[in-house]
Amino acid sequence: MRAVIQKTVGAKVDVVSENGTETCGKIDGGFVVLLGVTHSDIEKDARYVADKIAHLRVFEDGEGKLNLSLKDVGGSVLLVSQFTLYADAASGRRPSFSKAAPAEQAKRLYLHTAELLRGHGIHVETGRFRTHMQVSLCNDGPVTILLDSFMTRISPKMKVVPD
């Protein structure tokens, strides 16, 4: 599971259709998280990503140090599904998306990640799965972090959230 985490002071996601645009998620501050799921991802990957999102210390404390977590500051998450995080553009000019999970699996783990974040006491807004969306945000810092749960499987130093 891959997540691009962007610290924001405000963000929204609109669904675009032939009938126009509709805002389906909006937050005042916290993280915009673009979430991609691959074939081998399971609930353990969702737990790892949700735990990291909830506890990453990238918000300033009283001394200006990045020492506070999303939970500490009462921030929100705008969670947006993003299968293109598994694009392979190594050859040719058209990326392959064969590493992205099938829609049913991806949706299940995407929704599970949202519920896990809510279980941490975090307010979560979401995009709409399998739709054309436009994400608007004001990136703060900027702070942008890439998580890949696969790294927990290949690096013995990485801490994995217990079952």
UniProtKB/Swiss-Prot annotation:
Presence of keyword tRNA-binding: yes
Q: Report whether Aminoacyl-tRNA synthetase shows up as a keyword of the record.
A: no
Q: Which reaction does it catalyse?
A: glycyl-tRNA(Ala) + H2O = tRNA(Ala) + glycine + H(+); a D-aminoacyl-tRNA + H2O = a tRNA + a D-alpha-amino acid + H(+)
The record's annotation in InterPro entries points to:
Daa-tRNA_deacyls_DTD (IPR003732), DTD-like_sf (IPR023509)
Chain coiled-coil ranges: none
EC class name? hydrolase
Q: Which ranges belong to the motif Gly-cisPro motif, important for rejection of L-amino acids?
A: 141-142
* Molecular functions per Gene Ontology: D-tyrosyl-tRNA(Tyr) deacylase activity; Gly-tRNA(Ala) deacylase activity; Ser(Gly)-tRNA(Ala) hydrolase activity; tRNA binding
The biological process GO terms on file are:
D-amino acid catabolic process
**EC id:** 3.1.1.96
Keyword set, alphabetical order: Cytoplasm, Hydrolase, RNA-binding, tRNA-binding
Q: Which GO terms describe its cellular component?
A: cytoplasm
User: What's a Pfam family in this record?
Assistant: Tyr_Deacylase
Q: Where in the cell is it found?
A: Cytoplasm
Q: Which domain of life is it from?
A: Bacteria
Q: Which family does it belong to?
A: Belongs to the DTD family.
**What is known about what this protein does?**
An aminoacyl-tRNA editing enzyme that deacylates mischarged D-aminoacyl-tRNAs. Also deacylates mischarged glycyl-tRNA(Ala), protecting cells against glycine mischarging by AlaRS. Acts via tRNA-based rather than protein-based catalysis; rejects L-amino acids rather than detecting D-amino acids in the active site. By recycling D-aminoacyl-tRNA to D-amino acids and free tRNA molecules, this enzyme counteracts the toxicity associated with the formation of D-aminoacyl-tRNA entities in vivo and helps enforce protein L-homochirality.
**Record's comment describing the protein's domains:** A Gly-cisPro motif from one monomer fits into the active site of the other monomer to allow specific chiral rejection of L-amino acids.
Q: Which HAMAP family match?
A: Deacylase_Dtd
Q: How does it assemble?
A: Homodimer.
PANTHER family reported in the protein's UniProt record: D-AMINOACYL-TRNA DEACYLASE 1, D-TYROSYL-TRNA TYR DEACYLASE
From the Swiss-Prot or TrEMBL record, give the protein name.
D-aminoacyl-tRNA deacylase
**Native species of this protein?**
Neisseria meningitidis serogroup A / serotype 4A (strain DSM 15465 / Z2491)
Gene, per the UniProt record: dtd
